[in-house]
C-alpha cells in the first residue's frame, strides 16, 4: 500500500516530537538535504524588506564620558530626570542607552548636547 501526502500529514499530527525529529534526521541523511536551508531563505527575504523601510525611531547611546565625567553626569541628569546616583551609574556603565525611541531630530539634538559637554555619543 502506497502512502499519500494526507497519510503522512495525519501520522505527523499524532507523532511524538522525538519521532518527528528522527524522521527529519533520516530524510536529511537519505536525500542529502538540510531542514535549515528553507528557514534561512525566508529569513533573508524578510531581512531585506526590513532594510527598505526607513527607520523612524532612534536611540541615543552614550559610548563614553570622555574627560569630563561630572559634566556628562549633570547633562544626563538634566536629560533623563534621574537622581545623581542613577545618572552616575548610567554614565559609568557606558556604552549605554540614554534615551530610546526618539525621532531623528530629537536624537540628534540630544547627541549635540552630550557632545558639547565632552561625551562620545552615537545615534542608532
Curated annotation (Swiss-Prot):
Keyword line: Ribonucleoprotein, Ribosomal protein
Gene Ontology BP annotations: translation
Cited InterPro entries: Ribosomal_bL12, Ribosomal_bL12_C, Ribosomal_bL12_C/ClpS-like, Ribosomal_bL12_oligo, Ribosomal_bL12_oligo_N_sf
Keyword Metal-binding: no
Gene Ontology molecular function: any one: mRNA binding
Superkingdom as given in the UniProt entry: Bacteria
GO cellular-component term (any): cytosolic large ribosomal subunit
Record bears the keyword Ribosomal protein: yes
Pfam family for this entry, one: Ribosomal_L12
Quaternary state and interactors: Homodimer. Part of the ribosomal stalk of the 50S ribosomal subunit. Forms a multimeric L10(L12)X complex, where L10 forms an elongated spine to which 2 to 4 L12 dimers bind in a sequential fashion. Binds GTP-bound translation factors.
Function: Forms part of the ribosomal stalk which helps the ribosome interact with GTP-bound translation factors. Is thus essential for accurate translation.
Family: Belongs to the bacterial ribosomal protein bL12 family.
UniProt protein name: Large ribosomal subunit protein bL12
The species this protein was found in: Borreliella burgdorferi (strain ZS7) (Borrelia burgdorferi)
Lineage: Bacteria, Pseudomonadati, Spirochaetota, Spirochaetia, Spirochaetales
Primary gene name: rplL
Amino acid at each position: 500500500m502506497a502512502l499519500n501526502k494526507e497519510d503522512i500529514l495525519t501520522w505527523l499530527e499524532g507523532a511524538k516530537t522525538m519521532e518527528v525529529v528522527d524522521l527529519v534526521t533520516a530524510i536529511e541523511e537519505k536525500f542529502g538535504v538540510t531542514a535549515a536551508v528553507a528557514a534561512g531563505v525566508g529569513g533573508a527575504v524578510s531581512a531585506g524588506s526590513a532594510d527598505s523601510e526607513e527607520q523612524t525611531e532612534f536611540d541615543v547611546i552614550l559610548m563614553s564620558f570622555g574627560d569630563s565625567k561630572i559634566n556628562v553626569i549633570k547633562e544626563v541628569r538634566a536629560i533623563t530626570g534621574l537622581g545623581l546616583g542613577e545618572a552616575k551609574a548610567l554614565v559609568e556603565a557606558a556604552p549605554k542607552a540614554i534615551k530610546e525611541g526618539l525621532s531623528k531630530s530629537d536624537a540628534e539634538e540630544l547627541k549635540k548636547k552630550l557632545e558639547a559637554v565632552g561625551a562620545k555619543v552615537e545615534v542608532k
